[in-house]
Every structure is written in C-alpha cells, then in structure tokens.
Regions:
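Short, acidic/polar
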Residues: 6-22, 59-64, 88-93
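Acidic/hydrophobic-patterned starts of short beta strands in beta-sheet-rich repeat architectures
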Residues: 29-30
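Active-site mouth loops of central-metabolism enzymes
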Residues: 1-12, 49-57
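Beta/alpha (TIM)-barrel catalytic core signal, keyed to glycine-rich beta->alpha loops juxtaposed to Asp/Glu
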Residues: 35-177
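Short amphipathic alpha-helices and their capping/turn segments at secondary-structure boundaries
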Residues: 11-26, 120-129
Length: 177
C-alpha cells in the first residue's frame, strides 16, 4: 500500500498495488485505513488536540485525489476505517458542497462489549446513509468462548500476535461470560 499519507501519489500506489494483488482492473469499494490526523486511536478516550501533530492532507484534497481514481474506473466507491463523527461529517459536508465523491462506508469496531459506534457514529451514518462494515465482531475472538478459563489455543490470534491482551483482561473476560 501507499502508507498513511493520503495524497494522489500514495493513494495511487496503494490502489495499483491492490489491483495487481487482486488481479482485477477495478475495486468495488476502496477504503482509507486510519485517519491521518491525530485522533482517539485504539479506544483512547478524552481527545486532546496535539499542536505538534504535523501536516496532514486536507479532507478536500483527499476527496479530490480519490475522485481521480473513481473517474479513471480504478475504484467505484470509497469509504474509510477507524473514523470519527468529526471526520465523517467533514467528508460528507465537502462531498455535498463541492460535488466531490462521498464516503459510502465506515469500518469501525462494533460488538457486544464495544458499542462505542452507537455514541456518535451511528447517528451520522444513518442520517447520511454511510454504511457500517464491522470489524472485531467477536472482540478479537474473545466472544467466541475459545479463551475461557485462561485457554490459549495454539494458532489463535491472541497466541500468534502479542499486544492484543487488552481484550482478555479479567474485567473484559467477565463481560464476555
């Protein structure tokens, strides 16, 4: 992919790489992964503006870059992942006011124990008809029951990829039961 710098060059590299790997000439839905700007990553609460965060591409320039790939036929629709109500509202507003392509989907976490999507994203998603593509529907496998009573299946995500322990802490495990 093209990294997390959403300009025409890096988006083009990412799209072309995906087209090659998928052995196709177009992508039905191309999604941006993570906002460029600093935001509440990984469930962090209490957003604070980082005045040192550096440059990131404006929402409008991102939509203009994506528009070129829609017009060229490389992608049909666009969406994003891990976005906030602020980010989605900016994209929607610019799409309407500047006749730019609109975000059709947002891919955020949502499951029985992580329902933060309902706080702000659900309203704008429903009102603006921006579909939700859920990730972590089973809370990285914790809701499947395979980690009960301290079990750690050999080839499970938790065994293979360290750093996801926050989903298996004692308080979370009580909620899964």
């Amino acid at each position: 992919g093209g990294g997390n710098n959403f300009n025409e060059k890096t988006i083009g590299e990412a799209i072309d790489g995906s087209l090659k790997r998928l052995k196709t000439d177009y992508i039905d839905l191309y999604q941006l992964h993570w906002p460029e700007r600093s935001t509440n990553y990984f469930g962090r609460r209490d957003y604070t503006l980082d005045s040192e965060e550096g440059d990131w591409n404006s929402f409008e320039s991102v939509l203009k870059a994506l528009e070129k790939f829609i017009k060229s036929g490389k992608t049909r629709y666009i969406g994003m992942s891990n976005e906030t109500p602020y980010g989605l509202s900016k994209y929607i507003e610019l799409s309407k006011n500047k006749n730019l392509p609109r975000m059709m989907s947002v891919q955020n976490p949502y499951n029985l124990v992580n329902r933060t999507y309902e706080i702000g994203m659900s309203e704008i998603s429903i009102r603006e008809k921006c579909g939700l593509l859920v990730y972590y529907p089973l809370a990285t496998g914790a809701l499947s029951g395979k980690y009960r009573n301290g079990q750690m299946p050999k080839n499970s995500r938790q065994a293979l990829f360290k750093g996801w322990e926050r989903h298996l802490n004692p308080l979370a495990m009580r909620a899964y039961e």
